[in-house]
Regions:
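Active-site C-terminal subdomain of aminotransferase-like
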Residues: 111-116, 121-186
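Proline-centered turn/helix-capping motifs that create local helix->coil transitions or kinks
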Residues: 9-16, 61, 128-131
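Residues at alpha-helix caps and immediate loop-helix transition turns in enzyme cores, especially N-
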Residues: 3, 32, 61-64, 90, ...
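Alpha-helical structural signal in soluble globular domains
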Residues: 6-10, 39, 64-75, 93, ...
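Substrate-binding/gating loop at the entrance of the active-site cleft, primarily
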Residues: 1-14, 56
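Conserved active-site segment immediately N-terminal to the catalytic lysine
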Residues: 76-77, 83, 87, 94-111, ...
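Active-site phosphate-binding strand-loop segment of PLP-dependent enzymes
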Residues: 15-20, 24-84, 88, 109
């Protein structure tokens, strides 16, 4: 929530006006999917981004990311998911659902340990190298990276948003965890 609030403030908006939160109905613990879809529809004229978690970490509720994606995009909004509690826990089909982007950590259900690397997904329909971004050497086109020429030429996709590389030991822990997932056919 702090990231959203400060991002909205950075762009000169009041978080109380710009952020729409969907909460459970009185006396309930889970958010009904119909309430999420209704909130998207009711705010479609002023919504640029729908950002939701894949799983509510308090209740374990798995959200219907496919229908949320469809509703958000029908309203003309981009849609992204925080998959901190979904990655490594449930099957994800981000590309097939058409989600615009997602991010996740690997230290929880992917068992990579504290401080482990994270992940990001950007749907290929959003691979626009002209988008403004903070640029780093690891996001630069691999074919010409070592020429060190002026002007940033990003790699397509999520790779083009990389700034630098994590420590190698983080990769090692993550690889070991992924090998276990592979053995389990997950």
């Amino acid at each position: 929530q702090y990231t959203f609030e400060t991002h909205v403030k950075h762009h000169g908006f009041d978080p109380n006006d710009a952020i729409v939160e969907v909460t459970p109905r009185e006396g309930e613990h889970c958010i009904r999917n119909e309430d999420i879809l209704n909130a998207i529809q009711e705010n479609s004229d002023s919504t640029a981004l729908v950002l939701f978690s894949g799983i509510n970490y308090y209740t374990g509720q798995l959200f219907d990311m496919a229908s949320i994606t469809k509703a958000a995009q029908s309203a003309g909004a981009k849609v992204g998911f925080d998959l901190a509690h979904a990655a490594g826990n449930v099957e994800l089909q981000l590309h097939d659902w058409g989600a615009d982007f997602a991010c996740w950590c690997t230290y929880k259900y992917m068992n990579s340990g504290p401080g482990a690397i994270g992940g990001v997904f950007i749907h290929e329909k959003n691979h626009n190298n002209e988008l403004p971004r903070f640029a780093g050497w690891w996001g630069y086109d691999k074919a010409t990276r070592f020429k060190m020429e002026k002007g940033f030429i990003p790699m397509p996709g999520a790779e083009g948003w990389q700034l630098s590389t994590p420590a190698l030991f983080l990769y090692a822990a993550h690889r070991a965890a992924l090998e276990i997932f592979e053995e389990a056919h997950f």
